[in-house]
Structure formats: structure tokens, C-alpha cells
């Protein structure tokens, strides 16, 4: 897809895992130019497997050929926080950054953290983002955990929302716009 392919030209994302690319596009769509320049933007990320494709590649090399063949090019992407660090650098986010690793409810916890940060005036706006990449290992894990029996439809990609304090005259409802 052209919107995803353009991120491969970004030097910071040249060798990153797919989840970082998915999240970069979701962040780009959620942030407008005004928020990209704000000082107090926070970032909360929710995921369950992280960059599992690179993790599997890294550890399969270690297991099959020994620790001396562990690729230093792959290792940084095995850390759950790597997509968040890429996003913070790409978009100049200088506020708090946090990664939640969990099940399908991690997204709700990410929204709660954003709400707390805004209430405590830690951030003026918080980019809440969730993403996943698929791999046979992840699909096997979802099967073992019974997530498919609960109705999980596995997919890969990312989605993001920008959370901010409601206006004083707001009724507290959530407005979704294009």
C-alpha cells in the first residue's frame, strides 16, 4: 500500500519491523500539524506481541547457530518499546512515552493512562496507538490462549486516536471526525 510504502524511505524506519511502519502511518493520520509542534504531547502504545517477526528471526538465529550469530541489526527491534521510540523520534514527541503489553483490553488501559496524564496535566494531548504484526508464532499463541474461540479476528496494522481534555462546555461525549 502506498501510504505504508512511503515510510520505508524514512531513514529511521529503513530496517524496522512492520509494526513500527504501521504505527508511523497511524500516528501521521492522527496528528495534525498543530500537534506535531506542541511541547506537551504524550504517547501511549498498546500491543500484545510487539515486533514478533524480528524477535523470531533474532532468536531462531541464536538457537540454530549459537549466540555468536545473533544479529545486532535485529536485536533492537525485539524490545517492546522500539516502536514507541521510533515514533517519538519521528514526530518529535517530547512528552511521556509508555508501552502496554497485554491482551485485547490493552487498548482500554492505554486510553485510561491518557486520561490520567491529561487530568494530572502531564500532557496536553496524548497520542494513543495500538498495533500488531502477524506471524505464525503469534497465530499459534492466539490459538493456545483461546482467543479465536472468543471471536478474535487476527489482523495486522495500527490505529491511533488523539486524546485531549474536553472543552469546558462539553457534555463529555466523544466526537469522531474524518
What residue spans do the PLM features occupy?
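Acyl-CoA/ACP chain-elongation machinery
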Residues: 122-126, 130-144, 150, 178
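Beta-strand segments within the central parallel beta-sheet cores of soluble alpha/beta enzyme folds
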Residues: 40-45, 98-102, 123-130, 173-178
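Acidic, glycine-rich active-site loops and adjacent beta-strand->loop/helix elements
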Residues: 47-50, 103-106, 130-135
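Conserved beta-ketoacyl condensing-enzyme motif
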Residues: 1-86, 90-91
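A short secondary-structure junction signal
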Residues: 1, 111-112, 137-142
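Active-site pocket-shaping loop/turn-to-helix segments
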Residues: 7-28, 72-76, 97-112, 148-159, ...
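Active-site-proximal alpha-helical scaffold in enzymes
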Residues: 23-33, 83, 90-91, 97-129, ...
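Condensing-enzyme catalytic core mediating Claisen C-C bond formation in acyl metabolism
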Residues: 1, 142-178
